[in-house]
């Protein structure tokens, strides 16, 4: 929380800052470093879990057990009910998507500025490298574009180019094409846009709220002295702790929502493959599962 007190405004710790720049171009920024750190953690953690099984230790312990429980839940309870037999075709991507967003979200809550700023002297004006990369719209937009490409490639793979193009009619007669095609294209583009905006907005709003609450202490101290700062500080700090707990919940929730909605959109494109299949409706109890023919 120290960077929040030191910030000149509530958004100083949310916006991206250049660490190295040349000729006006930002070469390396806070958010780039935070994304690299999240990726590094994934590279270090998940191969270790794989080696654990390769060594014949089939029973996970400690943090491995926790991470495996999350992975099993995502596969069996989030992805498989939607994608069915095609789950294994997409699970690696969806696992990577979930944990990358989750790690970026959680790293933004950790006070690593104490190490990078006070000890190493890095970051914006030496205040340290910190920030939530997923509060940056361009980061979330990139994740959404990748999801968009995966979704459309799924449609092309299942339907072929002609079938994929035909699905823009939405099952309507050809004479309605001038109306249906623009509507379908708009809907196709709105999906990734909503993914990007939802994640960035939620991660940004929480940090700004936390900065405002903590900022009450500094404003009270400068306005009415140390006594006033102390009196205002007690409820402010308690409120900030509550917000931090809420932020942790939101960090997990937003990673889950992004992954879940991406899975649904993939499932919608994959499900088109079964529309002309005479056995498509044989299992009415599980209409959301994609048949893996």
Residue spans for each PLM region:
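Selective transmembrane helix interface/packing segments
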Residues: 1-293
């Amino acid at each position: 929380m120290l960077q929040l007190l030191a910030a000149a405004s509530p958004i100083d710790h949310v916006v991206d800052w250049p660490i190295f720049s040349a000729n006006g171009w930002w070469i390396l920024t806070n958010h780039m470093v935070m994304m690299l750190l999240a990726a590094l953690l994934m590279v270090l953690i998940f191969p270790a879990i794989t080696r654990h099984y390769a060594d014949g230790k089939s029973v996970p312990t400690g943090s491995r057990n926790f991470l495996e429980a999350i992975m099993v839940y995502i596969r069996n309870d989030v992805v498989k009910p939607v994608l069915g037999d095609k789950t294994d075709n997409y699970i690696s991507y969806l696992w990577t998507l979930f944990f990358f967003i989750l790690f970026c979200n959680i790293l933004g809550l950790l006070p690593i500025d104490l190490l990078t700023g006070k000890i190493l002297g890095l970051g914006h004006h030496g205040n340290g490298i910190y920030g939530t990369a997923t509060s940056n719209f361009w980061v979330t937009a990139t994740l959404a574009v990748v999801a968009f490409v995966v979704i459309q490639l799924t449609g092309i793979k299942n339907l072929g180019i002609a079938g994929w193009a035909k699905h823009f009619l939405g099952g309507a007669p050809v004479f309605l094409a001038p109306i249906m095609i623009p509507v379908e294209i708009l809907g196709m583009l709105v999906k990734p846009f909503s993914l990007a905006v939802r994640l960035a907005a939620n991660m940004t709003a929480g940090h700004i709220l936390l900065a405002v609450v903590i900022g009450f202490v500094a404003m009270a101290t400068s306005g009415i002295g140390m006594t006033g700062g102390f009196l205002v500080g007690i409820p402010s700090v308690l409120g900030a702790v509550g917000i931090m707990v809420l932020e942790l919940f939101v960090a997990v929730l937003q990673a889950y929502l992004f992954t879940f909605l991406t899975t649904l959109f993939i499932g919608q494109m994959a499900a088109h493959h079964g529309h002309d299949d005479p056995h498509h409706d044989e299992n009415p109890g599980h209409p959301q599962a994609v048949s893996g023919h």
